[in-house]
Design a protein with these regions (language model features):
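Arginine/glycine-rich "motif VI" loop of SF2 helicases in the C-terminal RecA-like domain
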Residues: 88, 154-162, 188-190
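Active-site/ligand-binding-proximal alpha/beta "capping" segment
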Residues: 123-158, 165, 216-222
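Short hydrophobic alpha-helical segments enriched in small aliphatic residues
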Residues: 4-7
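A cross-family phosphate/adenosyl-ligand binding-site feature
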Residues: 25-131, 169-204, 209, 215-226
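Serine residues within intrinsically disordered or low-complexity segments
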Residues: 9-10, 18
Length: 226
């Protein structure tokens, strides 16, 4: 996957040569040095391969060791619970953001550091983004995919400017990444939009990328449309 990512990066550099405004702006961008909180999107399913749970446990532990607070959807099972529990066991902090109706259904993790309840799903997602210095996405179902694509769209529009890392465990996100590359190839997206996200193959790589991805810039919204 690293070789594939390098090819995409080379393709990106080649294709945007004519976008002088974009290149001028990107050289001025700074990288995050002090990351205090990371939003983690992931599955609530308990019936998935253990490799996903191992990655979730390791990610929670790594973030806690770096004193990075985790912001998540407060799930009491699946990868959400795995990330939260491993972070707490390592001395970390976890803030849950969850709508009232999910609390009423008993879907919330009750042992987290901080609880924030919202009225709607949209309010929940907006608050999670506002509170975070970056996003890491582990594999998940429709909810996770919706959250990931929405935050990528917000970054494309200059609303969310911070790092987005896709943690591609077991090649789970490879079909999605190929679809996004196809969207670029067929002019549904611009070539430079490939830099809206980065791909990691391990929790260690995902955390490392947080500190190496340039912050996006609101000026890039001029490139949002084809």
């Amino acid at each position: 996957m690293k070789d594939e990512r390098h090819k995409v990066s080379s393709f990106f550099i080649f294709c945007i040569g004519s976008y002088k405004g974009f290149l001028t702006t990107i050289t001025k961008i700074k990288k995050l040095e002090n990351i205090k909180s990371v939003c983690v999107y992931c599955a609530s399913s308990t019936k998935i391969d253990k490799a996903y749970f191992e990655a979730a446990n390791q990610l929670g532990k790594l973030l806690a060791e770096k004193n990075i607070r985790i912001i998540n959807g407060a799930g009491c099972q699946g990868l959400m619970a795995a990330v939260s529990n491993s972070a707490l066991e390592a001395g970390g902090k976890v803030t849950r953001v969850i709508p009232h109706f999910m609390v009423e259904q008993g879907w919330n993790h009750t042992g987290l550091t901080q609880t924030i309840e919202t009225e709607t799903m949209h309010e929940r997602k907006n608050l999670m983004a506002e509170m975070s210095d970056a996003v890491i996405t582990l594999p998940g179902g429709c909810g996770t995919l919706e959250e990931l694509l929405e935050i990528i769209t917000w970054k494309q529009l200059g609303i969310y400017l911070k790092p987005i890392v896709i943690l591609n465990i077991n090649g789970y996100f490879t079909p999605l990444l190929e679809m996004l590359e196809k969207a670029i190839a067929q002019n549904f997206m611009r070539p430079e939009h490939v830099k809206l996200w980065e791909v990691a193959n391990s929790p260690e790589e995902a955390v490392h990328l947080l500190y190496s991805i340039p912050l996006w810039n609101k000026e890039f919204r001029k490139f949002a449309a084809i």
